[in-house]
Structures are given as C-alpha cells and as structure tokens.
Amino acid sequence: MEHTYQYAWIIPLLPLPVTMSIGFGLLLIPTATKSIRRMWAFPSVLLLSIGLIFSANLAFQQINGSFIYQYLWSWTINNDFSLEFGYFIDPLTSVMLILITTVGIMVLIYSDNYMSHDQGYLRFFAYMSFFNASMLGLVTSSNLIQIYIFWELVGMCSYLLIGFWFTRPSAASACQKAFITNRVGDFGLLLGILGFYWITGSFEFRDLFETFNKLNNEGNSLFPTLCAFLLFLGAIAKSAQFPLHVWLPDAMEGPTPISALIHAATMVAAGIFLVARLLPLFTGIPYIMNIISLIGVITLLLGATLALAQRDIKRSLAYSTMSQLGYIMLALGLGSYRAALFHLITHAYSKALLFLGSGSIIHSMEPLVGYSPDKSQNMVLMGGLTRYIPITRTTFLLGTLSLCGIPPLACFWSKDEILSESWLYSPSFAVIAYFTAGLTAFYMFRVYLLTFEGSLHVNFQNYSGTQNTSAYSISLWGKEEPKSVNSLFSTMKTNNETKNILFFEKNIYQFNENVINQMRDFTTPFLRKNTSMYPHESDNTMLYPLLILVVFTLFVGFIGIPLVQGEGEIDLNLLSKWLAPSKNLLYPNSEDSIDLYDFFINASFSVSIATGGIFLAFIFYGSPYSPLQNLDLMNLLVKIGTKTKRVSLDKIANIVYNWSHNRGYIDIFYTNVVTQSIRELAKLTQFFDRYIIDGITNSVGVLSFFAGEAIKYLVGGGRISFYLFFYLFFILIFVYFLFLSL
C-alpha cells in the first residue's frame, strides 16, 4: 500500500509526454510529425489508461483507509516562509482521478475519429493531453498554492480548446468571454488564498483547517467570511454558477468532444471540487454555507428555465450542466458531502454520454446541412433520426432518462438523495429543487423528441427566410465557404408537426395541405434509401465510447444505494464505506442508509414529477403520429378553458421563449449596463489623465518657458546661464519665505 502511494505523483505527469512530443515534433520535424498524426491518439489513450490503473488502485485502498499527505519538494525563501509541494490522496481525490481518467479515455478514443479530418488534429490532442495533466495535478494538490497553479493551467487549456477554431469570430469571442468571466473568479480566489494565509500562516489544507478552527472560536468572523466568499467566487466562475455562468453556453463553440470532457465531467467540476475540498473550512462560517446553498438553488432553477426554448442541441446540454451543477452546489451548501459527491459521479458519466451523443448527431447532420454550427446543431432542422442512427438514439435516450431521474439509472439515486436532504434544510429550497426536477425532464425530452422523433425537418427556405437553398460550410480552420445542398432535403412537415417543433418559437410556418400530400408521396421512397446524402450512423470508434458510457450510466448509481436490508444484514451503501471517515456535515450523527419503505416514499414523489415533465414534453413535442397526439390534449384544454385563458397561455409561452432566447436578460444586462459603465469610466479616466494630469504637467512647462522668455526680454540679452541662475535664485527666495510663513 505504501509502495503504491509512493508513486502516486506519477499520475499527473503521465499525459505530458504526448504534449511535449507533439510540440517538439511540430517545431523540429513538422512534416514527419504530421505524416503520422493519427498514431498520436494511441500513446494518448495508453498513458491515460495507465493513469486509470493507478487511480483505481488508490481508490480501492481508500476504502476504510486513511488520508495520505506526501511532500516531494520544498521551496524555502527564508526561515519564516516556505512552500511545500506534494500530493494529497483521500476519497475525494480518488473520485476525481477516476472520473478524469475514465471520461478522458473515452473522449480521446472518440476524438480520433471525430477530429480525423481536421487540420488541427495534432494541436487538439496536445491541448487535451495537457488539460488532463493539469486537471490530475489540480485534484492531487496538497495546498492552496498548488491548486491555484493548476487552476490557471486548466483554465488556459480551456481557453485554447474553446477557441480551437480561432478564425471563426464566434469562437474567438467565446474564448475571450470565458477568459474575462473566469478572471473575475480567479482574482477572487487569489485574494481569498492570500487572506487565509494572513489569518492562519499556512497554505496546507491540514494546517489550514486546524488553525482556523482554533481561531474561529475567538470570534471576529467578518474578515474570514470575506476571504471564504472570495474563495467561493473562484468556484462560482469555474463551475458556471450564477451570476458568472454566462461563459458556458458560448463555450460550446469548441469541438464537441471537449464539451464532454471539460464542460461536463471535469473542468466545470473543478469549482465543485474546490468547495468540497474546503468544506471543513466553510462549515465553520455559517453565512458562507447559506450563500453556497442559495447560489446553488438559484443556478439550478435558472439553468433549467434557460434550457426550455434553446434551438442549439449543445447549448441545451450546457444549460442542463449548469442546472445539475447547481444541484451539487446546493448539496454542498446543505453540508451533504456524500450526496454532492454522488451526484458529481453520476452526472459526469451521464452528461459525457449526452455530449458525445450530440457529437454523433451533429456528425450525421453535417453531410446534409454543411459544417455550419447554426445548422448542424439546430434541433429545428433535425427530427426522425431514429431510423438513421439507432445506436446513437438508444444511448442518447438512456442518458436522457438518467438525467431526468428515472430509476434504475444513475442520476436517479443521487438526485433523489439531494432532494431528500433539501427537505431537512429548507422546505422552500426543496420546492424549487423538485420543481426544477420536473423542468429537467421536460427540456431533456424536448431535446430528445425534436432530434429523434417525427420526420426529418431540413427546410432551408423556411428556416433562413431566403429563397436560395445554399448552406455555409465551415472549413477546417473556420473560414466560411459556400456549399450547395441538394434541394431534395427540403422535407415538408405537417401543420401539427411544425407547431410541435417550434413551440416557444416566434415564427410558425404554414404549408398548403395539398402541396404537402403531393410532396409526401414523392419524398417517402427516397427517405428509405440508405445513401450517403442522408444521416448515417457514426463509425465504431465513435460508438464504442458511447456504449461504454452507457454501462457506467446504468450501473454506477448502484454504488450509493442508501438502503439497508435489515438488522444484521449487508448494507448496500458502498459509497459511504468508500468515503469513510468523511461524514455528512449537516447531521453528523445521522445514518447514511435509510429504510426501504422510507426510500420508496421519497423516490416515488420525485419520479412522479419527472414523469409529469416527460408527459408534457410528449404533448408539446411528440410525433404527430403518437397516441398522445391523437388524443389532441391541447385542443381539449382550449375547449375546456375560455378564450382569455388561451390568450394567457400564449402570453406565458411568449414570456418563456423570450426569457430563454435572451438568456434571462443577464447577458444583455452585462453588455448594456456593466460593460458600458466600465467603458464610460475608462473614457472618464482617459479624459482625466489626458486633460488634467497631463495638463498640469504641460502647464508647468509652458509657464516656465514664458517666464524665461519674459526674463530674457526684461534683461535685454546676455548669456543664457545668467538668466537661468537669476530665475532660480528668485524661485529659491520665494520658497524660503513660503516655508517661513508656515
């Protein structure tokens, strides 16, 4: 056991050789390096697999084990200040190591095919390997300084990958937005680290917790509360929590595989990791725990409402990620360490599955609509993909059901535990959390139904509002190029189906029924042909990671089933044994396992809410040929209600659309108020600097010049040195008498 821990420092270093080899290869022998570029995927996967083996070994040894501090190197500046670098292994570290390596391996295998035709293939794998190394270094850090160093490296890799196609203006803008937003959080994190060092005199976690608990008993908690909030500010930005969440949807401009790794399973979880790591510190400051839970509940509701009317499939999943991270943050604010960590595990695998599934969907749509994200990621142009990509559809459906909280899939067990814990803390928070669970089921099945049910909705004329049928493809370096598209794929839709697709949308396009019937007979035979011009299933190297993540989605939830079979029998709660001696900080004396009857009572309520959300999604977005559509429930509701109620329903739908389409008006507020105010302040500062500061300086010079000229004129000639001496003499006399008067 000690022998394994002794070499744990190797884990963060394993991905680095790939990054360094690609970098030196492109610098020294670029032609040879590019000629064997597809071979670089193998060492990337191999080295990360070795890291997975080490991580799994450490995780098994952590069951009922103790924490391990190991110092590798010390930098001593003087006798009073030194920095010690090493690694810290505990259950939280083990969880994150396994998450990063497993999801990272799946993403690297997937990316080999997804990025195979991209000119930046080598650059992509270099960035990904460096990100994996930075993230592994972050979670094994033994002190706050180490965390901050790797925190910045993780952020740098994120910016590089978000702006991977840097010639596209939208990608460059998204990269800048992510950088600026995270600068706010990172600056707060740095100030918080320095503040706690000033309080405790140490950066080490163990010393920090012990010293702060002793000092906390003496009172005067204002400054520690401020420092703790600054630390939490870093987590708010990195984990896309309100109000610093605005960068995450724009980050979808990067390649889809990075969304699965960085913006679902790992980097956005870095903020969660930081709060979980510092939770013993935060629990001594009640105000901070209240703030954490409040930010979490606001974020989970906001993310769900913003996802209700999104057209872009990746942005819908991004807002879903934001909402689910809000659930985890709420659990941490409640002090429910185990529930938060459990949902972190289950959500990471389910959301990675969904993001990789969305990449497979986009990959299948690109031959039809071109390589423009506005079209290939637009759910309005999808539909009926079940018959073309059945494997992707099955995996995406399982990931959707898991995120909705449907048993026995993974997210059901963890989300239900958070919902139960929220009742113990605040019924009002619990009501919001349960309501958001219903919204989650609604918008996730909205994504699924718009993508896979019905028929193919590719219709460029009606979508773009133009008369031509040309699309725009984005080249491998982001340059837009015109690309002709076969007009055969302007598939007609029935009126009922069109309404379902564009619910919460501004414009609903109507078609003549006679034209629709004529075109349907013409297009149906062609739709049954398996040609390259129709959506097609992805290659095996993209499907294998999906199938493996399905296995995790199906079974990873069973490690935390909070059930006990009876007195003296086996406790099924393996996660609690793994996390021992970590305790639930909300109620330390409570048991982690609950009775079977109580569990089913709690679970039935959450499952009922999720089922209701799915039912509503089928009503609004289901196929026009489904049994629910035959019931015509919408018209039934209109007949039962009055015309006034119908108008009110339309107004509500319009409000929901505007709220979601405008991102809750938060981006508009930042642009029109915050950004504009900063610009006006900058202009005022520039005016003050140019006309006041520079004016005073220039005025002194001008006055000196005219004074010299006046003296020269009065004296009537002579050597210039005499004039200067005469001038300075009177200045000194004036200053002397001025000081005497004071």
From Swiss-Prot:
Tree of life domain: Eukaryota
InterPro entries: NADH_UbQ_OxRdtase_chlpt_su5_C, NADHpl_OxRdtase_5_subgr, ND/Mrp_TM, NU5C-like, Proton_antipo_N
Protein EC: 7.1.1.-
Gene Ontology annotations of biological process type: ATP synthesis coupled electron transport; electron transport coupled proton transport
Keyword Thylakoid belongs to the record: yes
Name of a matching Pfam family: Proton_antipo_C
Keyword list, A-Z: Chloroplast, Membrane, NAD, NADP, Plastid, Plastoquinone, Quinone, Thylakoid, Translocase, Transmembrane, Transmembrane helix, Transport
One Gene Ontology term of the molecular function aspect: quinone binding
One term under GO cellular component: chloroplast thylakoid membrane
Catalytic activity: a plastoquinone + NADH + (n+1) H(+)(in) = a plastoquinol + NAD(+) + n H(+)(out); a plastoquinone + NADPH + (n+1) H(+)(in) = a plastoquinol + NADP(+) + n H(+)(out)
Claim: Cell membrane is one of the keywords in the record: no
Membrane topology designation: Multi-pass membrane protein
Location relative to the cell: Plastid, Chloroplast thylakoid membrane
Transmembrane segments: 9-29, 40-60, 89-109, 125-145, 147-167, 185-205, 228-248, 256-276, 288-308, 325-345, 352-372, 394-414, 423-443, 544-564, 599-619, 720-740
Family: Belongs to the complex I subunit 5 family.
NCBIfam families, A to Z: NDH_I_L, PRK06590.1
Subunit structure: NDH is composed of at least 16 different subunits, 5 of which are encoded in the nucleus.
Function: NDH shuttles electrons from NAD(P)H:plastoquinone, via FMN and iron-sulfur (Fe-S) centers, to quinones in the photosynthetic chain and possibly in a chloroplast respiratory chain. The immediate electron acceptor for the enzyme in this species is believed to be plastoquinone. Couples the redox reaction to proton translocation, and thus conserves the redox energy in a proton gradient.
Protein name: NAD(P)H-quinone oxidoreductase subunit 5, chloroplastic
Gene: ndhF
